Amino acid sequence: MEEKLLRLRRLPAPLLAWYDENRRRLPWREQVSPYRTWVSEVMLQQTRVQAVLPYFQRFMEAAPTAAALAELPEETLLRLWQGLGYYSRARNLKRAAQTIMEDFGGRFPDSYDALRTLAGVGDYTAGAILSIAFGQPVPAVDGNVLRVAARITGSRENVLDPKVRAACRELMAAVIPHDRPGDFNQALMDLGAGVCLPGGAPLCGECPACAFCTACQEGTQRLLPVREKKQAKREQQLTVFVLRQDGCVALRRRDDTGLLASLWEYPHADGVLDETAAAAWLAQRGVAVKSWEKTVSAKHEFTHLRWRMAGYILTVEGDGAPDWVWADHDRRQQLAIPSAFQKFTREAEGE
């Protein structure tokens, strides 16, 4: 631990000098508030910065404060989030905003323990908010920081082990500069995202830590950090139906819990159905095929699941299943349909 600490103590000065020259210009950094920092950090979980930018702007226009977010209708919330994925993040944001209004009198919590009571706020997000928005010397340790720290110190410990993450947080707490804690944490984020890249692609020649980085000196960048092998994804095959009738398309709302909870989807069947089986499946649900227009295939990756989808675009007649809604174009624009069905949505809209 002492050797690791000695190396990391050399990091703040060159890292902050590098950050001052290379920092990313991002809207939540140009106008800092606890609320904006929180929303941006939640959006950035599992999502690239460039993908987040337009969503952040729209979200701030629709819900510029915790009070506005607490009152935002769920349908509007999910529509704003459509395409970002991991929709539980959006629901947790609203739940947390309601907690801020009800339990904290509308005042954003400024302590670690209080922040951790908010839905969806973990150790990293709490550290980011406290350091960036409140200037408190609290580390924010995510995958980028774990990678940077493992390479600088030469650690061969498994970074997916919670004990290793906790140890890294302890080390960073010992070296974070009290005069610029937010900049230090954001500099680490930028370094990990743009220079100390995963795999064999780090740009060591551009890194302010290269002179004292163990991995750079020993050529072990490809080996660090050590991670357990990911669990193989379960694969599920689906047949998706884009059913057209009188200018409307059939949609159904998913269950309130579980994967893609409460979002809207096209009717679909488990497995891959040929036209005969598909027509029978539809007939059981009260619709008859008038014309088969097109077949479409797509796939979508979730964290532990892969969907392989075969789809039919077709014109039908009949009422359909009780939980189906026949939505015209204007209504469809108001509903949150997950990006997993993006290819089918383009077909439904004639794009």
Language-model features: locations:
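Intrinsically disordered, low-complexity, charged terminal extensions of DNA damage-control enzymes
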Residues: 1-25, 30, 193-351
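Catalytic cores of DNA base-excision repair glycosylases
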Residues: 2-205, 209-218, 286-287
